[in-house]
Regions:
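Inter-lobe coupling/hinge segments of SF2-like helicase ATPases
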Residues: 226-232, 236, 248-689, 697, ...
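A general secondary-structure junction signal
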Residues: 50-52, 111, 211-213, 464-466, ...
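Accessory, non-ATPase domains that flank or precede helicase/AAA+ motor cores in DNA-metabolism machines
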Residues: 1-391, 405-419, 702, 736-768
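Short amphipathic alpha-helical segments
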Residues: 14-16, 183, 674-676, 722-724
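C-terminal structured "cap/appendage" subdomains that terminate the fold
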Residues: 695-735, 739-744
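Hydrophobic/aromatic-rich, well-ordered segments within soluble, folded domains that form packed cores
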Residues: 33-34, 91-94, 675-676, 680, ...
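Solvent-exposed residues in well-ordered beta-strands and their adjoining turns
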Residues: 9, 21, 681-683, 729-731
Length: 768
């Protein structure tokens, strides 16, 4: 008997060891799926991590707690070849180790659901029609047709089939004639015949039906490298500099201003990689971005391009996965965060566009990995594979690494076709509110700028980083605010459906007709979400063709495409949206962009608030002004004097970076220190408090003043669980493997206390 270590999709540390029956041993290898028993009645699909593994004298010596260990056997091997390549298994282990997450959680995040179940994936099949073999002679077929004179419809269908199959004359039919494959649906569409007519031809043994597997993936058109646009002088210089930097660096940062034409540089780099017979992974932070970029890449790379993200059906994702394992994989994969888990045989280039984006960081559930970091590690597993980070607003960590020489650095400071950067106009709404000159959240300057743009046949974008109709509703008599019963947050009002919802757990309730505290009916929304902005702007501009892009309006793949296509083609001319509209979308007719409230981002209680606000405002501003016209950005704020606001206006990333770097060094934050958050959750607040204090005390014994907390996070209760957070600030260069060891040891010591049996603990490494 041999033994194998198996990864199961369970949030438990380590592997499960199973016996491998001799009859299955030849089919077991690392990366194949196996069916295994667990407990008394459950069966799971696991992944073989190691085979064979040494078990010393399993029949005699394995004893735990006085009980002999018995090993269950694998039930079956589900694959003829591995569904995971060696590089993928290495990436799984790195993510599990670095982000302190059980490898079973990595399994759950990485594999499409259809591969996690023994019978989860069903290939799509279609019914085809063919002529019976004995009728593939002119005389035999003619006699058969003559005998069917009373079945005119059947004769019509048979003749239509022959025509579709490529037979122009009966004399052409021989047993060696190659007939075109015809689907039953195609034949029915051409002849308008019923299934009954075709079934009658089957009963006569004239036509034979057979089932054939057909893919769900669009085959696409052949690639057209000639569609690659030539680079201008600035782009060519940047392209050459990137190649030069890649000779001495595995990772290069392209810092290019908005609308500088970074995508065209990417396309040239992709083509170079393909010419060298290498594969390319192109990562984007938002699914919305893939809609626009897909069309550009398809025009060049055609059927060599595959797209992979969560809006595709599970069956489609399984088929892409299997295609990547085949001998004819996609050469270019365009995808969001989860695309890092796909198999690649010959990966040569990874492009991470908008590398600064928070969307690259997985939050819940585990593993809480950063796709940028994981993609860099993935590329390093392939010989000479390079990573290119691209953005107009680099993250502090990436720019610091580039400045320190760890990454290559290329700057692209000119916009494509020398389009001017937009004029950014600050509007002090604090003064306007005091003088009662605001119309809701809209300043007079905002309204006049939008009115003028629409009057010229141009488009405008309004940015408000909060979805829903209003952040909360409130009783104007007693101040009652409806809160989620399970979370420590107020409910958000959604007017279109007339309900209140919790954006943390999904709890919903109808808006009460009267206040439950004082019975007043004067219940109104407070604040402005995108839905309310849309409502009020329709009243002010009734002639405008308004679209809204937020999580509520883009829950399906087609919703993204429809909204973006409608705005691109002019069906809508005023787009209201949350942060997803800031992420690299290009619209030629947008001349005005409005940031409705910069302060809501700046005042968030997080050390990254200014960094994220600068990036968000700069990226949103970059949507204004494209071909032949300088754009205008209206930036509404109550704090126009803040340095970060002035830096956005001047498009002064260097000054922003320098100021923030000094602050980060002083207060021990990234890029000089690494952060690890330890979260504790429990239904009982006293229990989570005491557990947090005990764990914090044990960690302070090891890490001293590097430990902060436990504290309550901004939202201290979610889904009935009370939350506490402990922060570790660790110097760069510290032995991180020992840190993990100490963390786990301290936690194990705390969990020995029976009071903490139901305590949930997880880590967030490099949190955002």
């Amino acid at each position: 008997m041999t033994y194998a270590n198996i990864i199961l999709p369970l949030p438990l540390e380590g592997y499960f060891t199973y016996g491998v029956p001799d009859a299955l041993a030849s089919r077991v290898t690392a990366g194949v799926r196996v069916s295994v028993p667990l407990g008394k009645s459950k069966t799971y699909v696991g992944i073989v991590a190691d085979y064979p593994v040494n078990i010393p004298n399993p029949s005699e010596n394995d004893v735990a707690g006085g009980k002999k260990i018995t090993y269950k056997n694998i039930i079956d091997v589900l694959d003829n070849s591995p569904v995971l390549l060696p590089q993928q298994l290495k990436l799984w282990h790195w993510i599990s180790d670095y982000y302190m997450s059980p490898i079973g959680d990595v399994y759950k995040a990485a594999l499409p659901s259809g591969l996690k179940e023994e019978y989860g994936y069903r290939p799509r099949t279609e019914l085809y029609i063919r002529l019976a073999d004995n009728l593939r002679h002119e005389r035999t077929l003619s006699l058969m047709i003559d005998s069917m004179k009373r079945a005119a419809k059947q004769v019509e269908v048979l003749m239509a089939y022959l025509q579709l199959a490529g037979v122009d004359e009966m004399a052409e039919i021989t047993p060696k004639t190659v007939l075109r494959e015809v689907t039953r649906e195609e034949l029915m569409n051409v002849t308008h015949a019923s299934v009954g007519v075709i079934r009658a031809l089957q009963d006569r043994k004239i036509l034979i039906t057979y089932e054939k597997e057909v893919g769900r993936l669009n085959s696409g058109k052949p690639s057209h490298p000639e569609n690659i646009k030539p680079l201008n002088e600035a782009q060519t210089e940047a392209y050459n500099q990137i190649l030069l930097q890649m000779m001495s660096h595995r990772v290069t940062l392209l810092h290019g201003v908005t609308s500088s034409g970074k995508t065209e540089i990417y396309i040239h780099l992709i083509q170079k990689a393909l010419n060298e017979h290498k594969q390319v992974l192109y990562l984007l932070p938002e699914i919305a971005l893939t809609v626009q970029i897909t069309e550009r890449l398809k025009a060049v790379f055609g059927d060599r391009l595959g797209i992979y993200h969560s809006k595709y059906s599970d069956a489609e994702r399984v088929e892409i996965w299997r295609k990547q394992l085949s001998d004819s994989p996609y050469d270019v994969i365009l995808g969001a965060r989860s695309a890092i888990f796909l198999p690649f045989h010959r990966l040569g280039l990874v492009i991470i566009d908008e590398e600064h984006e928070q969307s690259f960081k997985q939050q819940d559930p585990a593993p809480r990995y950063h796709a940028r970091s994981a993609a860099i590690v993935l590329a390093q597993m392939y010989p000479n594979a390079k990573t290119l980070l691209g953005t107009a607003t680099p993250s502090m960590e990436s720019y610091y690494n580039a400045k320190q020489g760890k990454y290559g650095l290329v700057e692209l400071t000119r916009r494509y076709k020398d389009i001017q950067l937009p004029e950014i106009e600050i509007v002090d709404i604090k003064d306007l509110y005091r003088r009662k000159m605001m119309t809701g959240p809209f300043s007079p300057r905002l309204l006049s700028a939008v009115r003028e743009a629409l009057g010229r046949g141009e488009q405008a974008i309004l940015f408000q980083n909060r979805r829903g109709f209003a952040p909360m509703v409130e009783c104007r008599q007693c101040g009652w605010v409806p809160k989620c019963p399970d979370c420590d947050v107020s409910l958000t009002y959604h007017k279109n459906m007339n309900y209140l919802s919790c954006h943390y757990c999904g709890y919903t309730m109808k808006v009460p007709e009267a206040c439950p505290c004082c019975e007043s009916e004067d219940i109104r929304g407070r604040g402005y979400g995108t839905e309310k902005i849309e409502d009020e702007i329709r009243y002010i501009f009734p002639e405008a063709r308004i679209a809204r892009m937020d999580l509520d309006t883009t829950r399906t793949r087609n919703a993204y495409e429809r909204l973006i296509n409608d705005f691109s083609t002019g069906k809508s001319n005023l787009l209201i949206g949350t942060q997803m509209i800031s992420k690299g979308l290009d619209f030629d007719k947008v001349s005005v962009v409005v940031i409705l409230n910069a302060d809501s981002m700046l005042n968030y209680p997080d050390f990254r608030a200014y960094e994220q606000s600068f990036m968000m405002m700069s990226q949103v501003s970059g949507r204004a002004g494209r071909k032949g016209r300088q754009g205008l950005v209206i930036l509404q704020t109550k704090s126009p004097e803040l340095p970060v606001i002035q830096q956005v206006v001047r498009n002064d990333y260097q000054s922003f970076y320098s100021d923030l770097l000094t602050e980060r060094l002083e207060f021990h934050y990234p890029p000089f220190y690494r952060l690890v958050y330890v979260y504790l959750k429990h239904r009982d607040e006293n229990t989570v408090n005491s557990a947090g204090l005990e764990l914090g005390s044990r960690l302070r014994e090891i890490f001293s003043d590097r430990v902060l907390g436990p504290d309550k996070p901004a939202v201290a209760r979610v889904k009935t669980l009370n939350i506490r957070k402990i922060m570790l600030k660790l110097e760069n260069g510290i032995d991180y493997s020992r840190v993990r060891q100490y963390l786990r040891g301290a936690l194990e010591a705390v969990l020995k206390d029976k009071r903490y049996g139901a305590l949930q603990v997880y880590y967030d490494v490099d949190p955002l």
